[in-house]
Amino acid sequence: MAIISMKQLLEAGVHFGHQTNKWNPKMKPYIFGARNNIYIIDLQQTVGLFQNAYNFVIDTVSEGGEIMFIGTKKQSQDSIHDEATRCGMPYVNQRWLGGMLTNFVTIKKRIDRLNYLDQIFEDDSVRAFPKKEIMGLQKEREKLVKVLGGIQKMKSLPAALFIVDPKRETIAVNEAKKLRIPIIAIVDTNCDPENIDYIIPGNDDAIRAIKLFSSKFADAVTEGKRRYEERLQAETDKDAESSTVQQEENPEADIPESIETKESVSAAADSDLDENE
């Protein structure tokens, strides 16, 4: 059974591309035709390509990797925030900071600063500062939350990116390619698909289309996490079972050397009696 159906894609308007005079010729293989000067995307390909990307997300997360959700255009901001938050993944839905991937060491310092500000405001230790300085710290905190709030819990680089409109998010695409981080993207008829590892041909402007893909990938993340936890539990159980078997095969291994056996105590007592005689 397909993870996403043709009916869902049609209802979300995924098949509508851009006007025929605003296209990228490299998207020709994914175009079904044109109607009223609007390109129509071949949804048969979308279904198959989406399935590949969906499985990739599950596999990546099941190995402990994170998927960064990215979509800064107005139509995508809510879906990116809601779905990434639902599945516990990092996201960027406001502005992409240059170097967010390629200069993560510096970005991490800003995240640490945000965590510090959160802490002093939450435990009220900020009251030790002058009132004017508190206002400045509050403004700094709000600014950092806006651009870094979605990646505040990110400890290292993501294993892959999910991008809405790679044409808009060119900096993110370039940074990911430089670091060889795989990219999944909703690619409209005006986009260049060359730098995208997992192409999802579709409308990247319709809110319903963005919501559909974002929610499906969030589901894939959730499934990947379930498999990851299941694998960890299986490894823990295996280690425990192995330890139990070893103890059963060699029960004396657990007896501390400092504890004397009854036989050794008895032998020592007999020796003392012989000496006294």
From Swiss-Prot:
Which Pfam families does the protein's record reference?
Ribosomal_S2
Residues annotated as transmembrane: none
The UniProt entry, under Gene3D superfamilies, shows: Glucose-6-phosphate isomerase like protein, domain 1, Helix hairpin bin
Superkingdom of source: Bacteria
UniProt entry keywords in alphabetical sequence: Ribonucleoprotein, Ribosomal protein
**What is the name of the protein in this document?**
Small ribosomal subunit protein uS2
Q: Which GO terms describe its molecular function?
A: structural constituent of ribosome
